[in-house]
């Protein structure tokens, strides 16, 4: 990537930053126009950022022809050039709940009158305006810093971002000065990349090393942070933010207490949220705790702002009522378990698959989880990518017992229609895995596909 921005570093001026060796190679050939620079632009005018991904591509010629900076120095460069408008950076990591927690924090801070940027799975937003479309949960380091520059130019008070395990391991967040780091939970995901659950947990925990404010889930057994200054929130265990009583039948209703580090009760407040499930109660607590730590606003005022949050598209999204149809992004065992737990008082039908070319170890567990809770199960494709949909489905089935109400249909649209055709008025249909994604990846082709649109079209055709 290349960012065309004038920056100063060590008493020198540069017209751009890049972490792509191909940019420097093109400049050496007098072909700077390939990357939007002047054709004969000098390599001395482009600051090259070394990182974990590009270090093996840096040839001696590249090393000798341009100025280089380590990735962890980027934050200092940014602050030196834009320090008068530096926002408070809030990083949220965890297996599940990052997107919803980030969105709640963003919503509450906006309601409290702050200028806020939000970066994550759903894209890049500033003050309710989408700046960039969906991309990686945490983008490349240079794109991340480009987004920070935009937030600074817009005079944002806060920069809320999701932090993936890939980004932590690949050092895409190196050098960032976080005002607050938040943990939602640690279960299991991306074992195709991290190779073991122990390594995955280690990576997640590494985010909380060092100094700085931290807000952690007190009920999470796999957080190993020993920082005595850390804040905690919890449902089962008491923390700085705790639940005194709660109900989940019609959204979230409860009463919460905020305690400072001496654990004397300072504030209490009722809370209401248009969200379903215990997992969303955790997300809500994380968000409330974060806003309290960051702003010191009265707890009741934060709770009032929470009531205006309408949910996240594709996260426990109600697409149809009577019968009830929910679309959600849940694509891990734990994510599915939390959704099923939210509807365990209902008769559940579920449509789901698993992504191809990704962690295969979770597939049997997902199948077993579905069979534990649902009385109708429709196994289909998610984003098969270059894997055979049939082999993915077989992996899911390997974790299940033979059942009369287990149906296999690799075509996702047909599977959804099949489930809708047999859906009874007293059942809830959960369509899991893709959430608000509007595409399906089959082979190397990305085609338009939206679970929600399929459901709406089905019911529209029957009116």
Swiss-Prot record:
Enzyme class, UniProt record, top EC level: ligase
Free-text description of this protein's post-translational modifications in UniProt: Carboxylation is probably crucial for Mg(2+) binding and, consequently, for the gamma-phosphate positioning of ATP.
Biological pathway: Cell wall biogenesis; peptidoglycan biosynthesis
Sequence motif Meso-diaminopimelate recognition motif, location on chain: 382-385
Stated name of the protein: UDP-N-acetylmuramoyl-L-alanyl-D-glutamate--2,6-diaminopimelate ligase
Binding site for ATP: 94-100
Cellular component annotations (GO), alphabetically ordered: cytoplasm
Native source organism of the sequence: Helicobacter hepaticus (strain ATCC 51449 / 3B1)
EC number: 6.3.2.13
Catalysed conversion reaction: UDP-N-acetyl-alpha-D-muramoyl-L-alanyl-D-glutamate + meso-2,6-diaminopimelate + ATP = UDP-N-acetyl-alpha-D-muramoyl-L-alanyl-gamma-D-glutamyl-meso-2,6-diaminopimelate + ADP + phosphate + H(+)
Pfam families per UniProt: Mur_ligase_C, Mur_ligase_M
Top-level taxonomy: Bacteria, Pseudomonadati, Campylobacterota, Epsilonproteobacteria, Campylobacterales
Residues the entry annotates as binding meso-2,6-diaminopimelate: 358, 382-385, 433, 437
